[in-house]
Curated annotation (Swiss-Prot):
The N-terminal domain is essential for RNAP assembly and basal transcription, whereas the C-terminal domain is involved in interaction with transcriptional regulators and with upstream promoter elements. InterPro entries: DNA-dir_RNA_pol_insert, DNA-dir_RNA_pol_RpoA/D/Rpb3, DNA-dir_RpoA, RBP11-like, RNAP_asu_C, RNApol_insert_sf. It is found in: Plastid, Chloroplast. Keywords: Chloroplast, DNA-directed RNA polymerase, Nucleotidyltransferase, Plastid, Transcription, Transferase. It comes from the Eukaryota. This is DNA-directed RNA polymerase subunit alpha. The lineage of its organism: Eukaryota, Viridiplantae, Streptophyta, Embryophyta, Tracheophyta. In plastids the minimal PEP RNA polymerase catalytic core is composed of four subunits: alpha, beta, beta', and beta''. When a (nuclear-encoded) sigma factor is associated with the core the holoenzyme is formed, which can initiate transcription. Residues 1-233 are annotated as: Alpha N-terminal domain (alpha-NTD). The gene is rpoA. One of its GO terms (molecular function) is DNA-directed RNA polymerase activity.
Length: 338
């Protein structure tokens, strides 16, 4: 009787945090373990959790900046050390925490000379600045500067559209991703049919939430995704014959790819390929070749991809289709096509 109770208890899934540290105000790290799992379950959970951590958790960013003193994005203003473009990039890096729904307004109103930091941002009580020491600009002359800001809570990423500045309002690339990175690893133990697995999950965040908070939110989001399968099947949904057909678009290489990579390099580093809805086989081939982000992928040509072990022309077409559909970009056929 006692032996049976012990056997049952060892099969109860348990998780715990085995390491937690704060490297800086904008870099938190956590390492978690989940066990015991049956063979294959650790990879299933690990892949799903990583995708949810990187793509399903909402974050808060500054998405627009507006000032009457800014003639255009690449101008310089007398009395300010930084160019307008540099100021916008500094605003992009500001880490915010909020329970905001949608958007809200904030502002910076200062009189020089002064070193403007994140603490000078006047924001609603629902928005908290994680690191008030983050640098924005340096005013070297005695004049007034007011910048209007738009703050938004969302998920994923949004690249600004070129030439969309209106009335002195400039869009800023937004990376609504509080989780900087997430990795999982698997440890197997036992013999034969009794083999079990331990899942290790590592999470890095930008300080707007802790790794444990990120783990909880990602788990809730995954549960919400699966809940519909617990309900009765809808019987009155009729699909047309052509609704399940996918037509691959005609692919052309855009000459602006190199320019796109250079201009959006930071944002592209934070777009991981497992957010691109690639089939698991295609994703695993890319992963084994150290292609982890969209920037890594854009540095390859179609010819490079075909050199990857077990990578087929069908896989290349899938990659091209997703790049064209989601980002309106393409890969060159070879290194000399651009």
């Amino acid at each position: 009787m006692l032996r049976e109770e012990v056997a049952v208890s060892t099969r109860t899934l348990q998780w715990r945090c085995v390491e937690s540290r704060t490297d800086s105000k904008r870099l938190y790290y956590g390492r978690f373990v989940l066990s015991p799992l049956m063979k294959g379950q650790a990879d299933t959970i690990g892949i799903a959790m990583r995708r949810a951590l990187l793509g399903e958790i909402e974050g808060t960013c500054i998405t627009h900046a507006k000032s009457e003193k800014i003639p255009h994005e690449y101008s310089t203003i007398v009395g300010i050390e930084e160019s307008v473009h540099e100021i916008l990039m500094n605003l992009k890096e500001i880490v915010l925490r909020s329970n905001l729904y949608g958007t809200c307004d904030a502002s910076i109103c200062v009189k020089g000379p002064i070193n403007i930091t994140a603490k000078d941002i006047i924001s609603p009580p629902s928005v908290e600045i994680v690191d008030t020491t983050q640098h924005i600009a340096s005013l070297t002359e005695p004049f007034d500067l007011c910048i209007g800001l738009q703050i938004e809570r969302n998920r994923g990423y949004r690249m600004k559209t070129p030439n969309k500045a209106q009335n002195g309002s400039y869009p800023i690339d937004a990376v609504f991703m509080p989780v900087r990175n997430a990795n999982h690893s698997i440890h197997s133990y036992g013999n034969g049919n009794e083999k079990q697995e331990i899942l290790f999950l590592e999470i890095w965040t930008n300080g707007s939430l802790t790794p444990k908070e990120a783990l909880h939110e990602a788990s809730r989001n995954l549960i919400d995704l699966f809940i519909p399968f617990l309900h009765a099947e809808e019987q009155d949904i009729i699909l047309e014959d052509n609704q399940n057909r996918v037509t691959l678009p005609f692919f052309t290489f855009h000459d602006g790819l190199a320019k796109l990579k250079k201009k959006n390099e930071i944002a592209l580093k934070f777009i991981f390929i497992d957010q691109s809805e690639l089939p698991s086989r295609t994703y695993n081939c890319l992963k084994k070749s150290n292609i982890n982000t969209l920037l890594d992928l854009l540095n390859k040509s179609q010819e490079d991809l075909l050199k990857i072990e077990h990578f087929r022309i069908e896989d290349v077409k899938r990659v091209l289709g997703i790049l064209q559909k989601r980002f309106v970009i393409d890969l060159p056929k070879n290194k000399f096509s651009n």
